[in-house]
């Protein structure tokens, strides 16, 4: 055994374990503080039980600004941006996606979605503990 139980507890004390359920339509983030038996899901709006994050991005028209999740859906419905769905499938297939005559790498877009959605954890835990 590399560590005994006391040493292991010191090493991991305060550490946070993160689970990410990346789905085609919706994604969800959960976390648990090491040593506790409670798993929490990350709400997209603080104080609510809205845990599903639409797995989409939206590029705002005319600018290089990307929105994710519910904001992406909202902007696309208001016709203020271009919605990119099927992020996982597009990343698997490779190739480029063209929006407003500009090419985008689907793997980079999926990575952007992951980074933006994982930022929701900043409201719950510090990045150093993950």
Predicted regions and their residues:
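Phosphate/oxyanion-binding active-site loops and adjacent basic polyanion-contact surfaces
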Residues: 103-114
